Curated annotation (Swiss-Prot):
GO terms for cellular component: cytoplasm; ribonucleoprotein complex; ribosome. Belongs to the bacterial ribosomal protein bL21 family. Part of the 50S ribosomal subunit. Contacts protein L20. The keyword Ribosomal protein applies. This is Large ribosomal subunit protein bL21.
């Protein structure tokens, strides 16, 4: 069984037992999180697609860790004007362990 969930402005295809990295969630490590924004649920050849959400469906997950992705380097330059700007960014994430999918 799998589900397509929406969290942090992105969509993820998840199944029970998987680990995924999502945008940072305000939850402690070890805490259980319920994601109720389920866009689709599939079980073999049977697929249930919501308009836009599947009513009554939810995904339970446990917070495994918090961290930061690799650094992204930004470099801006204006040719012939002696202007250079360097900047870096590390996006924070939360790693989730999918426990169960309820449809």
């Amino acid at each position: 069984m799998y589900a397509v969930i929406k969290t942090g402005g992105k969509q993820y295809r998840v199944a029970a037992g998987e680990k995924i990295k999502v945008e940072q969630i305000a939850a402690d490590v070890g805490q259980e999180v319920v994601i109720d924004q389920v866009l689709a649920v599939g079980n073999g050849a049977e697929i249930k697609v919501g308009t836009p959400l599947v009513s009554g469906a939810s995904v339970k997950a446990t917070v495994v860790a918090h961290g930061k992705h690799d650094k992204v380097h930004i470099f801006k330059m204006r040719r012939r004007k002696h202007y250079q700007k360097r900047q870096g960014h590390r996006q924070q994430f939360t790693e989730l362990q999918i426990v169960a999918i309820a449809a």
